């Protein structure tokens, strides 16, 4: 265990696994567009996009739990203790983050949405250092946050203009989504030291996915045309989420929030809302 711990805290290993997460999340973007096309989910249909995401995350959670069961050679079902930790993570990460983001992104520009989304990692660091006091705030971390966010702003402004308007249901909801993401990151960092990060990830995904699906259906969302190709897309995206978010949870279990967040881009739901 000590050897595993040492490897997972080495900066090179953290950076490598972070890159794997980024590649997986990046690969999801064009596949999601294809999935929307095959399943006849319109780019402006927020409710159906939430249903799409809910099904994807429910399946991702089930896949993670199956993998954990195979690895441990026993059925890994969440007990009462794990559920106590999984519920707040589920509400912050899968439900809160994605619900508010999908609605917010439909009511703001891509530039402002991208810039506000870029705040997620830095909110997580501030919460970890200043609210939960899991780690010390240092000048290096402050510099990393400032430079990182400046980079996000520059990238999103290249060739685009920015208006300064602010709407609660638009920019406000995206900001709430990033606060939810920051909170979930800190919670995973705390809880993964007490329970298996893999089972925690699988459980919160399954519960959160079911809740998102029900919310989307309640908003009159649906998949317009269920085909074999569309189901294959959902399965691939579920695999991406299962692998990437589980790696992310494992990294957070062994490292400070700031070390993980400053090494790679936030796993924002932007990929699921791109069309």
Question: Can you describe what each PLM-predicted range is?
Answer:
Residues 114-117, 133-154, 164-170, 227-231, ...:
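Loop-to-transmembrane alpha-helix entry segments
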């Amino acid at each position: 265990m000590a050897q595993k711990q040492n490897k997972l805290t080495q900066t090179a290993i953290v950076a490598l696994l972070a890159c794997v997460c980024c590649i997986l999340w990046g690969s999801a973007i064009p596949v999601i567009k294809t999935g929307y096309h095959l399943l006849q989910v319109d780019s402006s249909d927020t409710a159906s996009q939430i249903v799409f995401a809910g099904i994807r995350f429910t399946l991702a959670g089930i896949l993670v739990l199956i993998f954990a069961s195979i690895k441990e050679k026993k059925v890994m079902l969440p007990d009462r203790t794990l559920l106590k930790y999984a519920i707040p993570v589920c509400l912050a990460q899968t439900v809160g983050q994605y619900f508010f983001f999908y609605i917010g992104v439909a009511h703001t520009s891509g530039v402002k949405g991208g810039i506000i989304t870029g705040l997620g990692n830095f909110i997580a660091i501030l919460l970890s250092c200043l609210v939960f006091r899991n780690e010390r705030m240092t000048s290096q971390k402050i510099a990393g946050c400032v430079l990182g966010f400046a980079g996000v702003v520059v990238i999103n402004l290249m060739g685009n203009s920015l208006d300064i308007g602010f709407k609660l249901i638009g920019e406000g909801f995206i900001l709430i989504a990033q606060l939810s993401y920051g909170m979930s990151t800190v919670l995973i960092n705390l809880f993964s030291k007490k329970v298996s990060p893999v089972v925690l990830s699988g459980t919160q995904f399954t519960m959160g996915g079911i809740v998102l699906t029900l919310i989307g259906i309640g908003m009159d969302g649906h998949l317009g045309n269920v085909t074999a190709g569309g189901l294959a897309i959902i399965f691939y995206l579920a695999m991406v989420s299962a692998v990437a978010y589980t790696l992310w949870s494992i990294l957070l279990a062994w490292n400070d929030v700031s070390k993980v967040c400053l090494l790679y881009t936030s796993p924002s739901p932007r990929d699921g809302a791109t069309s």
